[in-house]
Amino acid sequence: MLELTSEFKPSPDQQEAIKGIVKSIKKGNKYQTLLGVTGSGKTFTMANVIKELNIPTLIMSHNKSLCAQLYSEFKGFFSKNHVEYFISYYDYYQPEAYIPRTDVFIEKDSSTNEDLERLRLSATASLLSYEDVVCIASVSANYGLGNPNEYIGMVLIFELGMQISQKELLKKLVDMGYKRNDNFFDRADFRVQGDIIDIYPAYYEDEVVRLEFFGDELDAMYHYNVLENKKGKDLKRFILYPTSQFSVGETRLKQAIKDIKAELNERLAYFEHENKLVEYQRLKQRVEFDLEMLTSTGMCKGVENYARHLTGLKEGDTPYTLFDYFAIKNRKFLVIVDESHVSLPQFRGMFAGDRSRKQTLVDYGFRLPSALDNRPLMFDEFIHKNCQFLFVSATPAPLELELSKENIFHQIMRPTGLLDPLIELKDSDNQVEILFDEAKKVIQRNERVLVTVLTKKLAEELTRYYLELGIKVKYMHSDIDAIERNEIIRGLRSGAFDMLIGINLLREGLDLPEVSLIAIMDADKEGFLRSTTSLIQTMGRAARNVNGKVLLFCKKITKSMQEAMDTTNERRKLQMAYNKKYNITPTSVKRHIEESLKNEEDLGEIYRKGKKLEKMPASERAKLAKELRKQMLEAAKALEFEKAAAIRDEINKLRDL
């Protein structure tokens, strides 16, 4: 049962939208659209729709910053349910590629984020275990995963009193991808101490599962906090999932290896016939090494390129994705596409770019043709999935409107009574100086300023200029990673600085109630960043503050500017009439500032600055120990054993307190 927790109740305008959407979905309509202005509470409407339908829901967004914001909000709305997070686990990713013109092969290079990997595994585990699941996902949801039925077939179910020999259990754990590690015990590891076996599930954060045996009988089972050295909840039954969604059973693995060998022989015969000896040797060496690894360990580097064989699919079949984990046992589920006017075009372009790069790798003997089936969903496959869709946007594109037909629900009024912002036109000749004067007035009121420019270089130069004039300012563009972006947005809201300069990262979905001034530089430069949709979305960032105002710097009024101003002014009239009817006085949005995603690093800073450990709360000490443990493992991997030993001693000090 999905249970919504909130101190607020839907406004009349929200109630009407919720009622219409729920009725449309229950009637069986596949597509519907929520057209809601910025600040009208679309997220709260989405949460109420989910509660009323009470079915598993996938919420998709086009960027990681919005995913993080949605995850935080829905964790609050559905605190008693399973709210999961599924985005790419790469902090850095360079896919393998080959450039024939220069004969340059670029090896795959990546850096994975352990916490994001854990959250992905937690998402699939929850989908296979529970019905009350809300999952926030990025475009990663469209990329291939393992067969959910194979994944379920690999699970290990523990029940008190069950009989299993230690030898058999350890073999099963290894088959599931878990590694024995009696010294540096970490996620996806297990350790053995006599009749006690500790398992650290790959999708757990701080706790392990401790199994106590009497001979071959499972005598006791409970959660155990390794960092605090404390026993947790007793368990009567526990389901352990594999360490990877690509895990497969022994029978399937043997068949996959057989199929890969057959495809390899066929491809080698082709290269030999075409007298492509370099490609022949390259492919033979590479695939035979991968086969050896698969045979001995069940995994290999780049295992996803053999996904078609491992999942048992045929050439050209739709790959398994997160959607198939939702659809397990043919259950109904809802897909909400947030900021659909941006998300859907992004989904549409994914397949072509991926295919082009991989085709070159196949043609030149770096990969087997089956690697082409390790791909994202084609747009038609995505949009025709066996589920129902709700598109959400302040500016839906023609595609959403066409698909939804008459099932379009408007949400123009804000529960807070806030109006769309006032718009002022300013001469772009003196835009930097004019903005400085306007920004000072806003900052004196303890409010914030957003500035959007057209290039990274201009963002950086403008930041330097305003810093010299004494404004606390930062810039944000695509070179800044997801976690740092989150920190910058948090810093703006908390008052660490007063002005944020960006390009197109300041548009969709960012909820910044402290911002009362939006400055759009060079607003008359026609293009993607100054289209009608982009202008309306950017202006919307000022619609959460009662003093909201937008400055458009220009020399002329373009068609896009005029359309954006007309739409905004028309909405202001409707909103003013609504406020008068219901006697509403506009008030700025009040929104909690989320905790930093860098809490663990901050604790490390506190420790390094000499905060007394004995004065730290136990929960902080546990988090600090966790951070130090990561550093210890990294030092050990880098063969810096003295450093690792020193960190180990510090961890022991923490545990002794």
Curated annotation (Swiss-Prot):
- GO terms, biological process: nucleotide-excision repair; SOS response
- Which Gene3D superfamilies does the record cross-reference, listed alphabetically? P-loop containing nucleotide triphosphate hydrolases, UVR domain
GO terms (molecular function) for this protein are: ATP binding; ATP hydrolysis activity; DNA binding; excinuclease ABC activity
Superkingdom of the source species = Bacteria
Q: Which PANTHER family match?
A: UVRABC SYSTEM PROTEIN B
Q: Which HAMAP family match?
A: UvrB
Q: Quote the entry's note on domains.
A: The beta-hairpin motif is involved in DNA binding.
How does this chain assemble? Answer: Forms a heterotetramer with UvrA during the search for lesions. Interacts with UvrC in an incision complex.
Q: What is this protein called?
A: UvrABC system protein B
Q: Which organism is it from?
A: Campylobacter jejuni (strain RM1221)
